[in-house]
Regions:
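Compositionally biased terminal segments of proteins
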Residues: 1-182
Length: 182
C-alpha cells in the first residue's frame, strides 16, 4: 500500500470516526470514472458540512495534518484550503454552495486496496472539474466523456443551472460532450 493510500485511509477513518460525511474527489474519484486513470500526489476530500463548522471538521483530521488558525479562517471564508501531511497535499473542501448538498447525496462507495471508500460520483466530479477549469481538468473531462458520456451530459445540465449557458465553462463542457467519439 502506498503512502498516499495510507494517508487516504487515515483521513477516511478519522472523518468516519467523527461521524463527518465525506468523499474523496480529484484523481482518486477520477480513477473510477475513466478507462485509464492518471497518477496523483495529493488527496482531495470533500467534508459535507457547512464551512462555518470548519474548526470542528479540521480538528477531526488525523494529527499529522498541519492545521493553523489561519487555515480554519480560510475554509470558513472560501470553503476550501490546501493542508499538508508530511509533505503530502490534502485539499479540503467544505459546503459553501447549495450544490454541495446534492453532491453529498450522490456519493458512491468503491473498493480500494480491499476497503470501501466514499468518492464523488462522476457527474459531480465533472462539474467541479469544469468549474476549476485547469488544463488537466479538461483532459480529465475528455476521458470521462469517453468512459461515461451520460455523466458528462448530467454535468452539462447541472452546470447550466449553476452558471448559465453563456458561461465559458458551460460552453466548453458542451463542446467536450459533443466531441466524444461514438
Amino acid at each position: 500500500v502506498s503512502e498516499l493510500v495510507d494517508k487516504l485511509f487515515g483521513v477516511h477513518d478519522a472523518l468516519e470516526g467523527a461521524s463527518l460525511p465525506h468523499a474523496f474527489g480529484g484523481a482518486i474519484a477520477l480513477a473510477y470514472c475513466v478507462e485509464e486513470p492518471r497518477g496523483t500526489r495529493d488527496l482531495d476530500v470533500n467534508i459535507f458540512c457547512d464551512a462555518s463548522d470548519a474548526a470542528t471538521a479540521l480538528a477531526a483530521l488525523p494529527d499529522g495534518i498541519e492545521v493553523a488558525d489561519a487555515d480554519v479562517v480560510a475554509v470558513e471564508r472560501d470553503g476550501q484550503k490546501r493542508l499538508f501531511w508530511d509533505g503530502v497535499p490534502i485539499d479540503v473542501f467544505m459546503n459553501n454552495l447549495p450544490l454541495h448538498e446534492a453532491v453529498s447525496g450522490a456519493v458512491v462507495w468503491v473498493q480500494l486496496e480491499g476497503r470501501q471508500i466514499p468518492v464523488l460520483d462522476c457527474a459531480s466530479l465533472a462539474v467541479f472539474k469544469a468549474l476549476f477549469g485547469r488544463t488537466k481538468d479538461w483532459a480529465d473531462l475528455e476521458a470521462i466523456a469517453v468512459a461515461t458520456p451520460e455523466d458528462i451530459e448530467t454535468a452539462v445540465h447541472t452546470l447550466a443551472e449553476l452558471v448559465g449557458e453563456d458561461d465559458p465553462a458551460y460552453e466548453r463542457l458542451v463542446s467536450v460532450a459533443a466531441s466524444r467519439p461514438p
